[in-house]
């Protein structure tokens, strides 16, 4: 990001942002597996709720901060410097406090430490016997996420849904300036303040998910501590219903400057809450359903939704000084759609798509366990079926003579 801030031309800026995007994708890709390692079934939901809230608050807060920075004497370069400074701070904190979470790696390091102390070189972890070759590396890191994405109905549909949600998140970064700055004549900096509606909505969604955690933990206790993935879908079902309502609300109130700006701003309460509940519980569901390959399932999800996020996003406001915004490659999806169709019908198209996606969490709540039983990757000893097996085992033990 520091290189982006000092770029002299657009080509240099794009190359630097390309590498920034590659390295910035790491936390999003591995967080599911890391949280599966760190947190137990009772606390993982709250941890992912906090993480997801930050994921969505960032894009909504940054236009406000960036808008005022770029409109001040600091200029657009300090928007890049600010991001770089925050990234450097995160690197510093990670280097001090973040430790390895993957059990195989931890045990390998422990075995190596014992060998160094005892000089008994026969001590080793079984994973050290594995020969790391290029083929297995490609299979695990590249092919496995793609297999999960295209061979697992749960991963595919949840990923497509969250990719759409993620795209809408970045689409709002284009739609809000059109509604509030272009249509209503509000200055670019002040025109970012309606994002506060989305910010409050995200916080409401996070609170909704956390409110369902006691219910999930009761189900978890009834299931002998074994995850019940489908119970994660209840807040997602609420979000799936609320989301199209928020989109239609924004579309048909934002299109008319005669309607007070607070009305489309308040639609952010619905869309923000829905975005958070859908995205968050989708991640929780994938982690619970695919515990042993959770990182690969999340990587597949991150891969596809990042494409949607890039495709729905136009050129950031502070980069339009390079005077290349007429390029269809850079306008991509959002700007062209809202200018050609109008806010009302562009938002309605997205609302109808949200209605089409609405049944997904309801279908998996009913049929998810059956699909997981047919899966080659999802553990079969989780969910309601595991509870039945556990109860049968307890009954058999009671019937055995003592």
Tell where the protein language model's regions lie, with residue ranges:
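Extracytoplasmic gate region of multi-pass secondary transporters
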Residues: 140-206, 276-284, 313
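Intracellular terminal tails of multi-pass secondary transporters
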Residues: 77-78, 86, 91-140, 200, ...
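Interfacial helix-cap and linker-helix signal at transmembrane-aqueous boundaries
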Residues: 65-74, 97, 180-181, 213, ...
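Cytoplasmic helix-loop-helix junction between adjacent transmembrane helices
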Residues: 16-56
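Hydrophobic core of transmembrane alpha-helices in multi-pass small-molecule transporters
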Residues: 12-26, 34, 233-281
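Glycine-rich segments within core transmembrane alpha-helices of 12-TM secondary carriers
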Residues: 43-73, 78-90, 201-208, 304-312, ...
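Helix-breaking motifs and short loop linkers at transmembrane-helix boundaries and internal kinks
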Residues: 4-12, 23, 39-41, 74, ...
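Intracellular juxtamembrane helix-capping segments at the cytosolic ends
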Residues: 25-40, 277-290, 294, 300
